[in-house]
């Protein structure tokens, strides 16, 4: 039976009231001036932490956690946890905060649904991906200590935090993965060690018996393939350095070639064929990455191969992303970066206003591709809108056709 609200003190009632009104400064004052336990519950069995998660207020949640709130506590009448409420709120950063404080990912409510399943039910796909891609820090700490006959750990201890963040990335577009590797302190300089740790993680995920996680195993494999491609690119650049003089460093567009290995690879990933606009190098790389997954009997491998081998298959990057993060419905209003496919890209090309990017860096990297079409896109916005409408209609027809042909 749920507790009665009549049993709450005036201070406890005030805390609930301030949380529900998102009054952050008042909550901060109440918590700092009154050293109380914050795991009390209201008439529905909800704690202050659960209320703050329901509101999606990360700042208040952080205050409550700092005050000692139990991330898994609660007496909710339908067994919803704080992570359930955070997932329903749509705040992926809040979900990550709770999980980093020990929130149970597999906790189920009264209808047997986990936080990730509830997030998927209401269409909060970012929360689903964040929860499914979360990895406990303890899984990484194993590799920062020498094991068995090893004379040194596989992963230098000072790289543990940046590596942990790198492997939990949700956006697995190869351009974004390469950029994240470059931006993570120390990882690019230790790319060979990073690749070996990823391969070890892949093997461990596939040898856990009943707890085998094919999705995470493939994700580790895929990340290791991107790292390996950067290593190969670096070796090619090193071999070329002694063979070419400064004049040979001028490319076909009359610009000086960049010595940045990651940028060279990104430009290869982005370069599209003139005939059909498909990024051929990226497509070939991703298909080869799938083929190289060593666990051929796994369900995830068979599904991806079957999809890519079908007639008129989707892009390889969409297949890889769906395998790791799950399928998701259409979202016509989603603003996706044209360079790395990061969502909520708010920066538009200042000339044509037809494409969007995460930031100036993504726009710069994509400019060599976009500049050929920029003027045309800017001159005929009505035609572009018409084309998009036709594309949406075509996609809708194809999807409906596929659904009708599914076996009963």
Residue positions per predicted region:
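Ankyrin-repeat-protein effector appendages
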Residues: 2-14, 120-342, 347, 367-408
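Conserved ankyrin/ankyrin-like repeat signature
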Residues: 26, 59-60, 93-94, 126-130
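Ankyrin repeat boundary/linker residues
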Residues: 8, 42, 75-76, 109
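Ankyrin repeat domain, specifically the short helix-to-loop turn at the C-terminus of the second helix
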Residues: 29-36, 62-70, 96-104, 132-138
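Ankyrin-repeat junction/capping positions
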Residues: 39, 72-74, 106
């Amino acid at each position: 039976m749920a507790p009665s609200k009549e049993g709450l003190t005036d201070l406890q009632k005030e805390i609930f009231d301030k949380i529900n009104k998102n009054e952050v400064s008042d909550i901060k004052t109440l918590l700092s001036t009154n050293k109380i336990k914050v795991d009390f519950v209201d008439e529905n069995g909800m704690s202050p932490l659960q209320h703050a998660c329901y509101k999606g207020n990360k700042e208040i949640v952080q205050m409550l956690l700092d005050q000692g709130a139990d991330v898994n506590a609660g007496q909710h009448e339908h067994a919803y946890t704080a992570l359930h409420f955070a997932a329903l709120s749509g705040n992926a950063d809040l979900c990550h905060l709770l999980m980093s404080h020990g929130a149970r990912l597999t906790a189920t409510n009264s209808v047997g649904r986990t936080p990730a399943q509830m997030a998927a039910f209401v269409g909060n796909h970012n929360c689903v991906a964040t929860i499914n891609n979360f990895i406990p820090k303890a899984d990484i700490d194993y590799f920062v200590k020498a094991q068995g006959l090893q004379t040194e750990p596989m992963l230098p201890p000072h790289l543990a935090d940046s590596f942990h963040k790198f492997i939990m990335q949700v956006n697995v577009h190869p351009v974004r993965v390469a950029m994240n590797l470059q931006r993570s302190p120390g990882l690019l300089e230790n790319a060979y060690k990073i690749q070996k740790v990823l391969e070890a993680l892949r093997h461990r995920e596939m040898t856990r018996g009943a707890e085998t996680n094919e999705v995470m195993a493939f994700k580790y494999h895929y990340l290791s393939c991107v790292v390996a491609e950067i290593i190969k690119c670096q070796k090619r650049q090193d071999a070329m350095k002694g063979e070419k003089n400064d004049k040979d460093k001028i490319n076909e567009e009359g610009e000086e070639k960049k010595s940045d290995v990651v940028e060279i690879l990104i430009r290869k990933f982005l370069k599209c064929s003139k005939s059909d606009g498909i990024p051929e190098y990226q497509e070939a790389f991703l298909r080869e990455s799938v083929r190289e997954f060593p666990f051929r009997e796994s369900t995830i491998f068979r599904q991806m191969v079957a999809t890519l081998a079908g007639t008129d298959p989707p892009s390889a990057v969409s297949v890889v992303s769906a395998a790791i993060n799950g399928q998701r419905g259409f979202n016509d209003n989603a603003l996706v970066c044209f360079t790395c496919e990061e969502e909520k890209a708010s920066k538009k090309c200042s000339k044509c206003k037809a494409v969007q990017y995460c930031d100036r860096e993504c726009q710069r990297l994509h400019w060599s591709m976009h500049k050929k079409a920029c003027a045309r896109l800017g001159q005929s916005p009505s035609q572009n809108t018409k084309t998009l409408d036709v594309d949406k209609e075509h996609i809708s027809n194809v999807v409906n056709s596929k659904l009708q042909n599914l076996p009963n």
